[in-house]
C-alpha cells in the first residue's frame, strides 16, 4: 500500500496537506449532531458535547473508573501504565474489554452514532483507556498528532478515525486539561528520527520519538491559537485523529480523569506499520479484521450491571 503520510524518514520536518476529508458524511436533519457542530468539527478539528449523560449515568461511570483504579491486580498487567517517576497509575488500556460498563459506554448511541456520522462508516474501537492525572503529581504529555503514531507504528492508512474523551472529573484551566491547536488537523506535520524497537514501552510515559519540532509547533500555534476545552464530569470532547494536542502537568490538588475511546472506520483497518517492522501490541491497536460496533441505546445504568 502506498504511504500517503510518510514520517520519521527525513532529516527535516515537513508540513504536508491533509489528503482526507474531515467529515465523511453530508449533514441532514437525521444527523446525530447539529449542522453547526458538524461545521465546527470540520473547521476546528474538535467539538464539545455537554449534558448528554444524566447525573446518575455520570456517577455510574465514575464508580466504574474508581473500581478499575482501586484494583489493578484484577487487570491485565500489560495494560497498566504508571507515571514516569512513581507507581501512580497514569493510564489503563483496553478498558472496553476489561469493564462491562466501559464496553457499554463505547457502544452507546450518543457516542457511536456521532462517530459513525463523522467517519461515514461503521466503526470499531481502535484503542480505549482510562486516563488519570493525579493531583500534585500528574505529569505533562507533550504535543503530538495521534495519527502520526497510529500511521507509523500501527499501520492506520488514512485519517478516518477520531477520539472521544469522556470527562470523569471536572476539567479546569488549572488541572492539566487537554490543550488543542484548532485547525491543525488540516496539516500533517512529519516528525524526525527513526523509531526504536518497542518504543511504546517508554512513549506511553514520555514520548521522545514521533514528537513534532518546536519551530513547526510554534508556526501552527501562531496561525491557529491554542484552546483548552474544559467541562464538568460527563462532558465529551471529540477530536480528529490528526489534531495537534497535549496537556500540561497537574500541580493542583484536583485530579483529572477521563475515559478515552478511539473510533476507527471499519474500512480504515490497520495494515502493516508504515515506519517500523514490529507493530505495537494488541492493547494499543486493534489489529485483524474488525467487527462493526453494535450500537446500544438507553440509559447506561439500566443496561449494565453495577
UniProtKB/Swiss-Prot annotation:
Site entry (Important for ectoine stabilization), positions: 150
EC number(s) stated in the UniProt entry for this protein: 1.14.11.55
Catalytic activity: L-ectoine + 2-oxoglutarate + O2 = 5-hydroxyectoine + succinate + CO2
Residues where 2-oxoglutarate binds: 133
Gene3D superfamilies per record: q2cbj1_9rhob like domain
Cofactor: Fe(2+)
GO MF terms, alphabetically ordered: 2-oxoglutarate-dependent dioxygenase activity; iron ion binding
Comment on bound cofactor: Binds 1 Fe(2+) ion.
Pfam families registered for this protein in UniProt: PhyH (PF05721)
Ligand binding (L-ectoine): 127
Subunit and partners: Homodimer.
Function recorded in the entry: Involved in the biosynthesis of 5-hydroxyectoine, called compatible solute, which helps organisms to survive extreme osmotic stress by acting as a highly soluble organic osmolyte. Catalyzes the 2-oxoglutarate-dependent selective hydroxylation of L-ectoine to yield (4S,5S)-5-hydroxyectoine.
NCBIfam families tied to this protein: ectoine_ThpD
Protein name: Ectoine dioxygenase
Species annotation: Sphingopyxis alaskensis (strain DSM 13593 / LMG 18877 / RB2256) (Sphingomonas alaskensis)
Amino acid at each position: 500500500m502506498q504511504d500517503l503520510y510518510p514520517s520519521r524518514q527525513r532529516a527535516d520536518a515537513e508540513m504536508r496537506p491533509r489528503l482526507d476529508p474531515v467529515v465523511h458524511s453530508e449533514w441532514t436533519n437525521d444527523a446525530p449532531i447539529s449542522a453547526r457542530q458538524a461545521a465546527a468539527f470540520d473547521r476546528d478539528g474538535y467539538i464539545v458535547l455537554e449534558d448528554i449523560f444524566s447525573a446518575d449515568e455520570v456517577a455510574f461511570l465514575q464508580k466504574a473508573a474508581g473500581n478499575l483504579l482501586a484494583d489493578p491486580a484484577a487487570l491485565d498487567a500489560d495494560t497498566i501504565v504508571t507515571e514516569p517517576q512513581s507507581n501512580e497509575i497514569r493510564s489503563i488500556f483496553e478498558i472496553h474489554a476489561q469493564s462491562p460498563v466501559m464496553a457499554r459506554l463505547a457502544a452507546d448511541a450518543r457516542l457511536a452514532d456521532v462517530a459513525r456520522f463523522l467517519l461515514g462508516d461503521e466503526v470499531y474501537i481502535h484503542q480505549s483507556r482510562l486516563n488519570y492525572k493525579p493531583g500534585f503529581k500528574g505529569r505533562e504529555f507533550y504535543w503530538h498528532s495521534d495519527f502520526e503514531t497510529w500511521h507509523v507504528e500501527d499501520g492506520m492508512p488514512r485519517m478516518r478515525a477520531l477520539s472521544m474523551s469522556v470527562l470523569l472529573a471536572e476539567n479546569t484551566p488549572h488541572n492539566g486539561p487537554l490543550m488543542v491547536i484548532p485547525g491543525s488537523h488540516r496539516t500533517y506535520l512529519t516528525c524526525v528520527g527513526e523509531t526504536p524497537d518497542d518504543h511504546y514501552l517508554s512513549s506511553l510515559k514520555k514520548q521522545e520519538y514521533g514528537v513534532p519540532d518546536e519551530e513547526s509547533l510554534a508556526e501552527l500555534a501562531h496561525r491557529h491559537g491554542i484552546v483548552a476545552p474544559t467541562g464538568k464530569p460527563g462532558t465529551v470532547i471529540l477530536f480528529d485523529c490528526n489534531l495537534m494536542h497535549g496537556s500540561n502537568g497537574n500541580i493542583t490538588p484536583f485530579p483529572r480523569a477521563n475515559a478515552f475511546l478511539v473510533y476507527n472506520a471499519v474500512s480504515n483497518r490497520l495494515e502493516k506499520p508504515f515506519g517500523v517492522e514490529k507493530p505495537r501490541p494488541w492493547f494499543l491497536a486493534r489489529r485483524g479484521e474488525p467487527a462493526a460496533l453494535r450500537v446500544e441505546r438507553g440509559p447506561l445504568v439500566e443496561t449494565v450491571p453495577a
